Amino acid sequence: MKYIIFLFRAIWLALSLLILFFSMHRLSLLDSTRDVSELISLMSYGMMVICFPTGIVFFIALIFIGTVSDIIGVRIDSKYIMAIIIWLYFLSGGYIQWFVLSKRIINK
């Protein structure tokens, strides 16, 4: 059982890193704001899928955070920083799921 959980964790981490590297590579090729927005959305959906089911909760919270930041006027202009922040946000959700919660469930 421990090997299966380790395998899932390794696959999740590898997919997360691939999503980050692919996104950073594509961001360097894109110029229009619309294309950058679509790529960041696609990256978010990918991270949400591999972090399922906590990814859905984190995605809903991200929408709320984005709405609040628009209301108060907080804006990040760098597309790279924005993509990395969103990736780290979903990575933390996946970490909680695959390394904290799964460990507690297995120990019970």
Swiss-Prot record:
TM segment ranges: 4-24, 46-66, 81-101
Primary location recorded for the protein, binned into one broad class: membrane
Gene Ontology annotations for the cellular component aspect, listed alphabetically: plasma membrane
Location relative to the cell: Cell membrane
Entry superkingdom: Bacteria
Keywords: Cell membrane, Membrane, Transmembrane, Transmembrane helix
The name this protein goes by in its record: Uncharacterized protein YbfB
Organism: Escherichia coli (strain K12)
